């Protein structure tokens, strides 16, 4: 699966939206909204901008639209997180029986990039029905999901289920997302809180902003720059610790510090082998890491601690530690080893919304083809100059040294 943006996806051939229709209203038991979902709904309400994620998948030759629509219905109906909507402070499901998927008008070509982005964004927003979008374009199935419903791993899970359904294979079962919402929560973990306190002691009890000025004036974020590149064709032993130590080395000449404190997303599906790894839903927390320029061992130690922090709800950390939050978005460094998800699927890509930003976000992904990086940062002269230096320095740091094992 390539991690990119919709604007970079080649879409050729007839275009048909697979329209999702939900009869009646959501019903049944109510479940509490998660911390991520509440924050997401508040952000969308404040900005008016939906935040969606999604993907593409190759369609086998000769599969009719009716079969594709049936596959979409079975996959969506089988994932409770995709059938739920917010109801006040709770969420409530539609049933699979309330869903029908009907192929819409066939257009000779895909909409222009801006029009397609607008179409997906219009469908993938919180409302009375789930925020989902599906369409075919030539031999590609494209889908988008309001972030309320899912995370990046969910996109990969959905691609595999759609692939199986299109080939007539039975879909695997998995624990329901809404059951995880109501599962008993353990008491605050002293070790996990201790990791956060050690991090915050270093940062002055602040969740750090990006350490270099990016030239974003005023409270409004700037239009984004999207950079997608292959860093290494043969990463060898280039683990996340090596990457972070290299990133800290690239930032050091600009920040004046060998330490690069940041926050990384960590899934909350348990350790490898836990059946929750098959659950579709937004199951991501955050962990603190202090990467040190060129120091893989120290950086790897923080990543080991991130495993300890993974199960700690972020709201618990905020209540216990009361850190100062940055004015804008929190910078983020994400790493996913996509080789662990199985054999690569045809034309599988991860895409997400393009929205204004006032910080820098890095998505590193390891595939059978190498180490890739998707970066988003503000489109300002200052940020362009900074990121030219950072990305160039990162390429030199990773390509110009012996890569030491780490986590």
Listing of model-derived features with the role each one plays in the protein:
Residues 1-46, 69-111, 174-219:
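Short amphipathic alpha-helices and their capping loops
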Residues 1-47, 51, 59, 75, ...:
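Acyl-thioester-dependent acyl-group transfer interface
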Residues 2-5, 132-179, 383-400:
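Active-site-proximal acidic secondary-structure segment that organizes catalysis
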Residues 28-33, 50-56, 82-87, 122-136, ...:
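Flexible, Gly/Pro-enriched loop and linker segments at secondary-structure and domain junctions
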Residues 59-81, 143-157, 220-259, 304-311, ...:
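Acyl activation and transfer enzymes in specialized metabolism, enriched
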Residues 65-66, 104-109, 113-114, 121-122, ...:
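Non-catalytic sensory/regulatory segments that transmit input signals in bacterial signaling proteins
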Residues 93-99, 145-148, 375-382:
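Secondary-structure transition/turn motif
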Residues 166, 206-210, 287:
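Internal "kinase-insert"/substrate-recognition segments embedded within catalytic cores
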């Amino acid at each position: 699966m390539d991690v990119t943006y919709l604007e970079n996806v080649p879409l050729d051939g007839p275009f048909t939206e697979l329209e999702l229709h939900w009869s009646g209203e959501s019903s049944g038991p109510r479940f509490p909204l998660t911390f991520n979902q509440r924050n997401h709904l508040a952000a969308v309400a404040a900005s008016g901008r939906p935040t969606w994620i999604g993907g593409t998948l190759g369609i086998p030759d000769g599969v009719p639209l009716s079969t594709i629509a049936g596959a979409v219905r079975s996959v969506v109906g089988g994932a409770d997180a995709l059938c739920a909507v917010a109801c006040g402070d709770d969420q409530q499901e539609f049933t699979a029986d309330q869903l029908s998927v009907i192929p819409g008008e066939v257009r000779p070509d895909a909409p222009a990039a801006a029009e397609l982005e607008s179409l997906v964004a219009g469908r993938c927003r919180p409302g009375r029905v789930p925020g989902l979008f599906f369409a075919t374009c030539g031999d590609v199935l494209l889908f988008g999901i309001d972030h309320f419903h899912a995370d990046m791993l969910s996109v990969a899970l959905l691609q595999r289920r759609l692939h199986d359904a299109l080939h007539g294979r039975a879909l695997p079962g998995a624990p329901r997302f809404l059951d995880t919402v109501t599962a008993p929560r353990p008491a605050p973990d002293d070790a996990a809180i201790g990791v956060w306190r050690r991090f915050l002691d270093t940062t002055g009890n602040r969740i750090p902003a990006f350490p270099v000025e990016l030239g974003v004036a005023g409270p409004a974020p700037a239009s984004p720059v999207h950079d997608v590149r292959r860093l290494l064709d043969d990463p060898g032993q280039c683990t996340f610790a090596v990457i972070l130590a290299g990133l800290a080395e690239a930032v050091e000449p600009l920040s004046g510090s060998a330490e690069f404190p940041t926050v990384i997303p960590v899934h909350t599906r348990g350790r490898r082998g836990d059946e929750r790894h098959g659950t579709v839903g937004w199951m991501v927390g955050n962990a603190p890491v202090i990467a040190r320029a060129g120091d893989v061992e120290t950086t790897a130690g923080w990543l080991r601690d991130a495993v300890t922090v993974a199960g700690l709800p972020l709201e618990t950390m905020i209540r216990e530690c009361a850190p100062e939050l940055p004015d804008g978005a929190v910078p983020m460094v994400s790493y996913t080893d996509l080789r662990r998800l199985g054999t690569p699927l045809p034309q599988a890509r991860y895409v997400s919304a393009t929205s204004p930003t006032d910080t820098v976000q890095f998505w590193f992904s390891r595939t059978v083809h190498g180490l890739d990086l998707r970066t988003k940062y503000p489109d300002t002269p200052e940020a362009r100059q900074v990121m030219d230096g950072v990305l160039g320095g990162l390429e030199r740091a990773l390509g110009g040294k012996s890569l030491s094992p780490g986590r």
